[in-house]
Amino acid sequence: MNSLTIIFLLSGLTAYHAVLADGTGSSESVTAGDSGVVVLVMIGALLTLLMTIPIIGLFGIYVRTRASIEEMRGILMQIHLRLITGDQRSNRGDVELGAGASLLTISSQPPSYAEALLMEPVEPQQQEGVPLEAEIRV
């Protein structure tokens, strides 16, 4: 017998008579029609539970992907507007863009990912124990 049959025997939901440990049979039994309904309800509940988990997971992936696409679209639109207007300031507004930005041409197409990386200013990193002014000698 499988575990589902054992559960039904113990719960009294099948038409089988449960045999007790002392060998006597129990007088309690339920018709087979009732057990069929119970089985269908249990299978339906199990399938519903199993289907909600992947649906919730897929919805979460969709929401995260959608947010990432919208964020990237906003960043590309800012870069595109900067190219059109000739604005060469970074997001902080006071740092001029590096020499790589002057190589870009103004076009009606949004810049590629590589061009967008060229537009970001690279700030010098201070090495431990060395003053920043000593590193930037020109």
From Swiss-Prot:
Protein's membrane topology: Multi-pass membrane protein
Q: Which organism is it from?
A: Ictalurid herpesvirus 1 (strain Auburn)
Could you name the Gene Ontology cellular component terms for this entry?
membrane
Principal place of residence: membrane
Q: Which gene encodes it?
A: ORF6
Its localization reads: Membrane
Q: What is this protein called?
A: Putative membrane protein ORF6
Which parts of the chain span the membrane according to its record? 4-20, 37-53
Keywords, in A-Z order? Membrane, Transmembrane, Transmembrane helix
